[in-house]
Structure formats: C-alpha cells, structure tokens
Regions:
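Local sequence-structure signature of Cys/Sec-based thiol-disulfide redox active-site neighborhoods
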Residues: 36-53
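Stable alpha-helical elements in mature extracytoplasmic
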Residues: 47, 54, 69-72, 104-108
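Boundary at the C-terminal end of the N-terminal hydrophobic targeting segment
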Residues: 30-34
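Thiol-based oxidoreductase modules, predominantly thioredoxin-like and allied folds used
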Residues: 65-76, 86, 94
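Thiol/selenol-based redox catalytic cores and closely related redox-interacting motifs
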Residues: 79, 85-163
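Iron-sulfur (Fe-S) cluster-binding segments and ferredoxin-like electron-carrier domains
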Residues: 56-67
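N-terminal secretory signal peptides and thylakoid transit peptides that target proteins
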Residues: 2-20
Length: 163
C-alpha cells in the first residue's frame, strides 16, 4: 500500500517558515544573551542622579556594568570620537559601540543584535520621559525624542523614535 502526501503551496510555505524559525531562534537567543553579558563602561559626573537611574534601567534589562568612571564624560566622548552635538550627561562603551545619553535598553539591544556599521547611538540632551529622566519628580511627563544612529563619519539618522 502506498500513501501519497500532497502539500499545498501555502502549507509548504508555513512549514518552511516554522522550520526556519525553529532553527534560527536558538542562535538569536544566544546572540542576544552574549550581547547582554558584554560589559559596559560608563563615564558620568559623580553627582548626577539621572545617570545612576539610567544605569539601574540598563541593569534591570540585563546589562552588566564593568566600570563606572565618576570623572565626567566630555573627555571620554571626545576620545571615543563622538561629536559634542550628540552629547548628554553620560557616555557608555558597550562592545565596540558608543552609547550616549538616556538611550532605552531596547535600542541598545537592537544595536547589538543588528550590528550596523556605526560609531554608536545617542539620545542628545536629557529628554524628560527617557530612561533615567522618568522618575516621579517629572510627574509622568514624556517628551518625544529620537535615538540617533551615529555613523563613523559624524552623520546620523533616526534609529528609533519615542513618544
């Protein structure tokens, strides 16, 4: 007795997508875990409370802090090649990327997952409602802001918008 199995195109496509997901999911999860265990080095002012709150946000989202330098961040930002126009109150180095300012952990995770050809990402200034600038003192206020992807040539474009 012979049994014939016939797959429609739709069923074959669903099977292919499900198979690809099953094969790729462990690799993506391992890649994300590896990114999160990459140490983070931070430069900030010793008395800056919002920087400390941003660090807590990053740690709560799985990032490991290797070193905190309470010496300010202007010299570190310049040494790492990030223009002052992208500046904020703290600068971090995560893997090979500069992370400037109150960047959400989700944006950093995306940066590490996608690995774009870039110097890093930045949230210039100190937008209210961004991580570290979102405490009770701000009364729930949330300003719109953008996380910028900064290229090595100094140009940038919007990496992620937040409202």
């Amino acid at each position: 007795m012979t049994t014939t199995l016939t797959l429609s195109r739709r069923a074959a496509l669903h099977w292919a997508v499900a198979s690809a997901g099953a094969v790729m999911a462990p690799a993506l999860m391992a890649q994300t875990k590896a990114a999160l265990t990459t140490g983070m080095e931070i430069w900030k002012d010793a008395s800056c409370g919002c920087c400390g709150d941003w660090i807590k946000h990053m740690e709560a989202n799985g990032f490991k802090v290797d070193a905190i330098h309470d010496t300010g961040n202007n010299a570190a930002r310049a040494r790492l090649g990030l223009a002052a126009k992208y500046g904020s109150c703290h600068t971090a180095l995560i893997g090979s990327y500069v992370v400037e300012g109150h960047v959400p952990a989700a944006d950093v995770k995306r940066l590490l997952r996608e690995k774009p050809q870039a110097l890093g990402i930045a949230v210039p200034g100190m937008p209210i409602g961004s991580p570290g600038m979102d405490g009770p003192v701000y009364g729930g206020r949330r300003d719109k802001y953008d996380t910028l992807l900064v290229k090595r040539d100094g140009t940038s474009h919007v990496f992620q918008s937040h409202s």
